[in-house]
């Protein structure tokens, strides 16, 4: 299995993020509201054409986890001009990070409250301020140092903390296509037994912020190999299945994408290329 896994140190994590943003392409997360559409004309690639936002195509059912299953999945190339700055812990700790400080923060970053950027900042701060639901652990990392320390504190009482990411592998980098494609499980997905997992998603904000969350139980982690329909792109990396969705918001988009009754069944998903997945025994 070719997905990236190694014991984590700060220099290794810094190198990893550089590879995600510079060497490899990653999922573009513009500083916009989650409600703003991307407006790309790719509806002809959808299963049924009912979703306009291609980033919704990361969810799947646990019954799909088998050799030969074909799924539409979307990856998008990152525009380096839109990657926000990465702050050190010392720099990040000087800036308040809470919705209660929103007015100060908007003024500090010269962002209008009613702009898409202002709405996106508010949504990020709200998500980071929300209390974890029962059985969940969560935090927001505003620097690499804080994310690494909090990940160790949350799921690894010892040094046995590893990181996984999604990688796109092609024989020629010029042939990478970051669009909605059909991918097929090229190998039997491998379940990683007995591990704790913490998924970290980059959030829209004026500097790099990762929202990290996981569940104390009821989560299955898999390593997967996905081959594009044209046989050119091999995607390797982690996939997670949340076995108990009974506490989820009934309006969660995953239920709509998968066409299942809210809170009635497990929900699985792949990870965008700029996400980080921490795992620990």
Curated annotation (Swiss-Prot):
Pfam families: BURP. It comes from the Eukaryota. The lineage of its organism: Eukaryota, Viridiplantae, Streptophyta, Embryophyta, Tracheophyta. Disulfide bonds: none annotated. It comes from Brassica napus. The BURP domain located at the C-terminus has not been identified in non-plant proteins. Residues 59-281 form the BURP domain. InterPro entries: BURP, BURP_dom. One of its GO terms (cellular component) is protein storage vacuole. This is BURP domain-containing protein BNM2C. The keyword Signal applies. It is found in: Protein storage vacuole. Residues 1-25 form the signal peptide. Keywords: Signal, Vacuole.
């Amino acid at each position: 299995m070719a997905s990236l896994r190694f014991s984590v140190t700060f220099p290794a994590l810094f190198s990893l993020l550089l590879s995600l943003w510079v060497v490899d392409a990653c999922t573009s997360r513009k500083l916009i509201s989650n409600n703003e559409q991307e407006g790309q004309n790719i509806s002809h690639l959808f299963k049924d054409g009912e979703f306009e936002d291609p980033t919704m195509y990361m969810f799947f059912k646990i019954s799909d986890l088998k050799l030969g299953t074909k799924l539409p999945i979307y990856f998008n190339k990152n525009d380096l001009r839109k990657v926000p700055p990465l702050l050190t812990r010392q720099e990040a700790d000087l800036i308040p990070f809470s919705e209660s400080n929103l007015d100060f923060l908007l003024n500090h970053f010269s962002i209008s409250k009613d702009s898409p950027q202002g709405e996106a900042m508010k949504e990020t701060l709200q998500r980071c301020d929300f209390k974890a639901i029962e059985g969940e652990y969560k935090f927001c990392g505003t620097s690499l140092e804080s994310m690494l320390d909090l990940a160790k504190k949350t799921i690894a009482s010892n040094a046995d903390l590893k990181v996984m990411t999604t990688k796109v592998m092609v024989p020629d980098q010029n042939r990478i296509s970051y669009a909605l494609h059909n991918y097929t499980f090229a190998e039997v997905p491998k379940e990683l037994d007995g591990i704790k997992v913490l998924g970290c998603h980059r959030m829209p904000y004026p500097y790099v912020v990762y929202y990290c969350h996981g569940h104390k139980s009821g989560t299955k982690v898999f390593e997967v190999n996905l081959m594009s329909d044209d046989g050119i792109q091999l995607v390797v990396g982690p996939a997670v299945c949340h076995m108990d969705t009974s506490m989820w918001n009934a309006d969660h988009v995953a239920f709509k994408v998968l066409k299942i009754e809210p809170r009635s069944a497990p929900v699985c998903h792949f990870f965008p290329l700029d996400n980080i997945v921490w795992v620990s025994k």
